[in-house]
Amino acid sequence: MRYNIFLRIFTLRYTQGEKIKMGMTTLCYIEKDNKYLMLHRIKKEHDINKDKWIGVGGHFEHGESPEDCMFREVMEETGLTPTKYRFCGIVTFLSDMGTDKEAWEYMCLYHIEEFKGKIKECDEGVLEWVEKEKILDLDLWEGDRLFLRYMQERIPFFSLKLVYEEGDLTAAVLDGKPLEFFDILDENGNKTGRIKERSLVHEDGDIHGTVHIWIRRKTGKGYDLLLQKRSKQKDSFPGCYDISSAGHISAGDEPLETALRELEEELGIKAEPEQLKKICMHEGSMNGNFYGREFKNHEISTVYMYEETVDITKLKLQKEEVEEVMWMDQEELIQKVKDGGIPNCIYLDEVEKF
């Protein structure tokens, strides 16, 4: 009885006259000698995964548990029998399939660490062992790159929701928290019409928009600039000195609204739009390797100046972003950036502009 109710949930239903396909599947990544067994989907002509590289797996059959489905699909597609495996998470897919209809699917993700048997030819495509560090060179769905990383990093059991529109990943939610997406820009700083999840942007080095807000005060010998020290928990350049306040422009947002929000979130400064003076645009690239992952940053920044009186003892710092702040003479800062006098992620040519 309970199964019949469950089965009814994952049948076709109608919304405003259009069918929504619903189902449950498994996807399995088999590992051996630091390689994954990947399936290149090139055999079927009408295949939503045509030419993509994926793991092995498929749809549940009547009465199957996730493990039943996993064992059966792995045997059918590879000839192997898993002997050690992890149930890594649930991935929810919502896709328009490039049509006016939606498909809604729940996928059980498995990492198979040990197995027995010999690999056979697969009717779904071509099986190939691929070194883990070369997986990202393959033609993967963008969302696959996210759950592959979570699987590889062995994060606790997770729930990931992926939304696709006309084949492009347009939204993702990890354990109930929406992931951030950016507009992808061309070389002239214009929006291309594509959006992309934040971590994938920094894996690929895509051009994206940011805002930089410099807080400046006049002194007897020139100007002081307010620097923030990035939190040690930051995913890039932890513990480095940086611009007074900065942030990414989320997909669909504008630079000024982003700058006002970042000032308030990071420092507790509630500025008025007219108090932020746009001084220039800046394009910069800065790469690194953090926590074992390559980080490629290529940004086009709208740079603002804020010159209202600021008492740093009264600032409300966002602790997960900012460890501390301090004033520094502008010329001294330029010299320290040049000679590496302080750990920093500041663009020298930007701070020299004003």
Question: What do the predicted segments below correspond to?
Answer:
Residues 10-28, 33, 177-220:
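Acidic, metal-coordinating catalytic segment for phosphate/diphosphate chemistry
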Residues 30, 109-113, 129, 215-217, ...:
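Short, well-ordered beta-strand micro-motif
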Residues 36-76, 164-177, 198-210, 221-261, ...:
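Conserved Nudix-box catalytic region and its N-terminal flanking loop in Nudix hydrolases
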Residues 48, 99-102, 218-224, 293:
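Short, solvent-exposed loop/turn segments that connect beta-strands within catalytic domains
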Residues 61-96, 100-103, 212-216, 256:
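Short, well-structured hydrophobic secondary-structure segments
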Residues 79-117, 132, 232, 268-312:
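Active-site segment of metal-dependent pyrophosphate-handling enzymes
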Residues 121-180, 239, 245, 280-354:
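Nudix hydrolase/Nudix homology domain
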